[in-house]
Amino acid sequence: MLENLKKEFLQPSEEFTPIPFWFWNDYLTEEELDRQMLAFKEKGVDGFVIHPRLGLPEEIGYLTDTYFQYVRYAVKRASQLHMKVVLYDEAMYPSGSCHGQVVRENPAFASRGLRMSDRESAEEGELLIAAVKREGKTWYFWEGPSGGTIRGVHYGEDDGEAGAPASADLMNPEAVALFLQLTHERYYQELKEYFGNTIIGIFTDEPNILGRCSKEGMIAWSGNFLEDFYRQGGNEQDLYLLFADTDSSEGRRAGERYKRAVYERMSRAYYRQIADWCAAHGVAMTGHPEKSTDIGYLQHFTIPCQDIVWRYVAPEEEKAITGEHSTMGKCSSDSARHRGKRRNGNECFGCCGAPEDPYRFTMEDMKWYLDWLFVRGVNMIFPHAFYYSLRDRRKEERPPEVGMHSSFWEDYHIASDYIKRMCGLLTDSVNQAKVAVLCRDVYKRQVEKMLQDGRMPTVFQSVNQPNGWDRYYEMTERYDKLGF
C-alpha cells in the first residue's frame, strides 16, 4: 500500500490535473487554439474550462455556428491529446440567462424582486402583492422586474453598459428550463459523442437571483413566491420586517423564514433541474453558488466548488482565518465528504494579485493559495485564468493572468505536478476529524427538527424555552464573528 502511494505521489495521475479557466477573449483560430493546447499539455495541464470571455468579437457570437466551429475543434483536439474539458454554461457570468437569450425569448422571464414603498403607485411591470399597516402608515409591497444584468462577452456588454444582457428569473422553473434548452441542450447536440468521456462536466457560476446592477432597495423574489414564504411560516407583517427591522429578534426570525423559502425555491427551480440534466447526460454538475457560505446548495453538485476572488482570502489582515470567506475551503470539502462525493474544487486566483499591483502574482503567491486550499481538503483546482489573449484592454479584465503569458510559465510544470500530487493524495485519503461546526442555517433547521422529534440533547434544551431562540441567535452570531 505504501509503495503504491509512493509511486502515485512521484508519478501523479493526469486525473488530478489543474483545470484552468481558458478565457476565449479575442478572435479565435484553430491554429492558435492548437498552439495553446499543446503548450498546456507540455506543462502538465491536462484539462481546461472553455470560458467565453469579455473581448470575444461579435463575429463569433455566443452559441452561434461560428462559435461551435471552434468549440468542436478544441474538444476534438482535447480528445486526441487525452485532455479533459469542462464546459461553462454562460457568457460570461453570473449563470442562468444564456447571454440574455432567455429574456429575449420571453420578457416575463427577466429577474424579479420585491420592494417596499409608502406610495400606492406601481412602476412599469409591477404587481402589488400586499399592503401592510405598520408604524402608523400603510406600506405597499411591489413585485416587479429587478433590472438585473450579467456581464457579457462582447465589448459594450459589461456592468452598467447599454448592451449588458438581461439576467433571468432563476427562481422560475420555466425560465431555468428554457436556459437548459438554449444552453445545455445545444452543447449536447453539437458534442454528444464527447459527453462523459472528454467532456467531464458543466460549470455553473455564482447564479444571482436579482442579477448584477439591479434596482436598489429590492430583495430577491419571483412569481408565486409569497406562497413559498407563507409555507415557511412567514406572513404579511414579516414583509415589513424584511426591509425595515432586520436587527431585532422578530426581524431575524422573519429573515430566517425568508432565507429558507429562497433556499427551497432556488434549489427546486435552478440547482435541482441542472443537476438532473447533467446526471441524465453523463457529466458532472460543477461550479459554485453565489456566496462563500452557501453550503446547502452544494448538495446538488457532483463536484461542489467555491471560489477565491478579490483577495477576500489572503495572507494579510487575518483574512485566511476570519470572516465568511475564510469558510469556503471547508464549505466545499466538508459538503463533499458529508455526501460521499470524491472531488471538490475551487476557482482560485481571480483578482488575487498584489494589493499595490493587481497584475503581480508570483509562484510563491500561487503556492500560498494552493496550500490554504489543500489543508482544508480541496482536491480539484480551477486556476483563474489562462488568457487566450492579452491584446489591448483584455489584460485589464480581472487579472492576474496565471497561464502561458505569466512570468512563471517556464516553470509551470512544477505547479502542475504539485497540484496533481496534493489533489491525488487528498482525494482518496480519510479525514480524521471527529468534531463538526455546523453552519448557521443548517444548524437551525436541525435544531428545530430535533426539538420536534424530542431528540434534542439536554445542553440545547434552553432554545425551546421563552427567549430561547434569542440566545440561539446570540450564540450563532458569535460563531459568525469568528468566521465559522
What annotation goes with each model-predicted range?
Residues 1-7:
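Basic/polar N-terminal segments that are highly enriched at the extreme N-terminus
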Residues 8, 12-19, 29-35, 47-48, ...:
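Carbohydrate-binding surfaces of carbohydrate-active enzymes
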Residues 24-25:
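Alpha-helical support elements that line or immediately flank enzyme active sites
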Residues 34-42:
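Extended, non-globular alpha-helical segments
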Residues 51-177, 181, 192-193:
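Acidic/aromatic-lined carbohydrate-recognition and catalytic surfaces
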Residues 182-186:
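A Trp-anchored, charged/polar loop motif used as the substrate-binding/catalytic surface
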